[in-house]
A protein has these predicted regions:
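P-loop NTPase switch module centered on the Walker A-proximal segment
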Residues: 1-104, 142, 210-213
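Interdomain boundary/hinge elements
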Residues: 36-42, 150-162, 196-206, 242-255, ...
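Canonical P-loop GTPase G-domain recognition
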Residues: 121, 131-191
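Short glycine/threonine-rich beta-strand-turn micro-motifs
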Residues: 165, 349-364
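Conserved nucleotide-binding/hydrolysis modules and their immediate coupling elements
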Residues: 204-307, 317-319, 482, 491-541, ...
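Helix N-cap motif at beta-to-alpha junctions
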Residues: 228, 278-279, 359-365, 407-411, ...
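Long insertion/accessory domains within large nucleic-acid-processing enzymes
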Residues: 255, 260-263, 396, 441, ...
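A short, contiguous, amphipathic alpha-helix enriched in charged residues
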Residues: 314-337, 551, 555
């Protein structure tokens, strides 16, 4: 029997989690010394590298002094809560990584709370102690207070602390005495984290994630809860709904470094990949052939936000994407459902080309849209809507805990902005020159808040939010106050026309771009919509007096990210998403029809 430790890494975005895991892999000799390791091995998805966040959870294992350490990477965002809960089910202990300057952040709370409820033993790593102005002692106190708040047990509160800098590759027990490697941390993991319990009996494995290989099809990944799984043995899959299916394991793989390694048996406590099964979902149990005993399935938080997805029916349909039809989008959404636990998809009112897609928040859904866009899909999405529930006859809506960290002089602005959106301030902490303000705010109020907060604080604010609970409906919230500027007809936008219209508002297009009638090309300074003709060229005739010819000076366009577009649009607008561009448009492109329907 090999000695095993299963450990989950918990950290806030950008606190150095992935870097630390990379260094652990170096220590476990997973890279040859000359091999290029361009940083972030775990954030292998392009989107993750660009945004600097972890979305999917990954498994890696290293060998340290004869013990196999399985390292599980968890996402830090509460939008990906479904991912977090799956991973923690496989671990026996957790590594809580905090920044020596910032201390524990709101999202860390979310994952830590789940970990402590599952009874995992924590090791606290205070990272980035080489930063100027860091305060490791205070941060340690903050972590201790946080654990007390989250009802940690006596045993969990007696946690070891390791100080160090993952970037510079050292860890030790005193932050004033840098060492030259991270051995201290690895030794602590083996000493403090309990080995998985060896349970004898019939085999049980709860499927906690899926892998896919074009060669063998779908692969089930999970931790052997009890007994031993063998290569080629007959097993029963118990589905979540109680049905059972007999099948056979073709191959078993364990995780070795970054890849898989074929093996003939896996003992309880180890994490493995099972190949050759068909028809299984996350949360199913693989159990004994003769007398199956399923494990309880994973409970995942319900979605709080939904969006309308539909096919692209704009005049520029099919010019840029490979997959544009409803069949393509339907297949892609079904594929996403297999591995994305917190997602729900329903057809919209008996139509075949519209779907209501629900998820954990704007970020969760925008990552899905962005991934589809990069794969060559064209689609349109509507304004994000909050999912209401009726509890004891009262209409309730999701409320989130919002934390904003800003320099002191902007604090009053922030409080004003959030309270206008029906937020209640719960606490305010002064941390040197910055303040930490906490609010309870309806999820509706968060849509579109980030852009305003960043503008009002000159880009200084750090904002994080997580779902708290459902509370009674708080009343109307005023949304964007400016109207849209809408293109009159299809054609190429000219600098001459844009220049003459610049006093009407700011534009989202550059001269030379193709536009179509009904596309939203800018933001009007007033609250009504304005139809403008940006395709009007200058008449080159001799009729007018020469000489009064001024050069057009066009202010550069406002560039918006996908999240900003989703938060910006109104209910009568769509965001059109194609692999090369993102446009906003009115749902009804025809101006006369739009006018008529407004009169009704």
């Amino acid at each position: 029997m090999q000695d095993i430790r299963n450990i989950a890494v918990i950290a806030h975005v950008d606190h150095g989690k992935t870097t630390l895991v990379d260094k652990m892999m170096l220590a476990g000799k997973l890279f040859r010394d000359g091999q290029d390791n361009s940083g972030e091995v775990l954030d292998s998805n392009d989107l993750e590298r660009e945004r600097g966040i972890t979305i999917l959870s990954k498994n890696v294992s290293i060998n340290w002094k004869g013990t196999k350490i399985n390292i599980l990477d968890t996402p830090g965002h509460s939008d990906f809560g479904g991912e977090v809960e799956r991973v923690l089910n496989m671990a026996d202990g957790c590594l809580l990584l905090v920044d020596a300057f910032e201390g524990p952040m709101p999202q860390t709370r979310f994952v830590l709370q789940k970990a402590l409820q599952l009874g995992l033993k924590p090791i606290v790593v205070v990272n980035k102690v080489d930063k100027p102005n860091c305060r490791p002692e205070e941060v340690y106190e903050m972590v201790f207070d946080l654990m007390c708040d989250l009802d940690a047990t006596e045993d969990q509160l007696d946690f070891p602390v390791v100080y160090g800098s993952a970037k510079n590759g050292w860890m030790g027990e005193d932050y004033n005495k840098p060492t030259d490697n991270i051995d201290y941390l690895l030794d602590k993991i083996i000493e403090v984290i309990p080995a998985p319990k060896q349970l004898e009996g019939t085999p049980q494995l709860l499927i906690t994630s899926l892998d896919y290989s074009s060669y063998t099809g779908r692969i089930a990944v999970g931790r052997v809860h009890r007994g031993t799984l063998k290569d080629g043995m007959n097993v029963t899959i118990c589905h979540r709904d109680g049905t059972q299916e007999k099948t056979k394991i073709k191959e078993l793989h364990t995780f070795e470094g970054m890849g898989h390694k074929k093996t003939d048996h896996v003992d309880s406590g180890d994490i493995c990949a099972v190949i050759g099964l068909e028809k299984f979902e996350i949360g199913d149990t693989i159990c004994d052939y003769e007398n199956p005993e399923p494990l309880p399935p994973i409970a995942v938080d319900e979605p709080t936000m939904s969006m309308l997805f539909t096919i692209n029916d704009s005049p520029f349909f099919g010019k840029e994407g490979k997959f544009c039809t409803s069949r393509h989008i339907q297949e892609r959404l079904n594929k996403e459902l297999e591995k994305n636990l917190a997602l729900r998809v329903q057809p919209y009112e008996d139509t075949t080309d519209k779907w209501i897609v629900s998820g954990r928040g704007v970020l969760h859904l925008s990552v899905l849209i962005e991934t589809m866009r990069r794969e060559g899909y064209e689609l349109q999405v509507g304004q994000p809507q909050v999912i209401y529930k009726e509890i004891d006859g009262v209409k309730c809506e999701p409320v989130e805990e919002l934390t904003i960290n800003v320099p002191e002089e902007f604090a009053s602005k922030m409080i004003d902005m959030v309270t206008r959106r029906k937020g209640d301030m719960t606490s305010m902490l002064n941390m040197g020159e910055r303040v930490d303000i906490e609010f309870d705010i309806p999820s509706r109020g968060i849509i579109g808040l980030r852009t305003n907060v960043l503008t009002a604080s000159q880009g200084e604010a750090i904002m994080a939010h997580r779902f708290k609970e459902y509370q009674p409906y708080k009343g109307e919230i005023s949304r964007r106050s400016n109207g849209s500027m809408i293109a009159l007809e299809t054609g190429t936008a000219f600098a001459y026309a844009i220049d003459k219209l610049q006093d009407r508002g700011k534009f989202f297009i550059d001269p030379g771009e193709e536009v179509y009638g009904g596309e939203v090309v800018g933001e009007h300074v007033h609250d009504n919509d304005l139809v403008v003709n940006v395709t009007k060229a200058k008449q080159l005739t001799n009729v007018r007096a020469s000489g009064s010819d001024d050069k057009a000076r066009v202010i550069p366009k406002t560039v918006m990210s996908l999240e900003e577009c989703l938060e910006y649009i109104r209910e009568d607008e769509y965001v059109e998403v194609t692999p090369k561009s993102m446009r906003m448009r009115k749902i009804e492109l025809d101006h006369l029809k739009r006018k008529r329907s407004n009169k009704d």
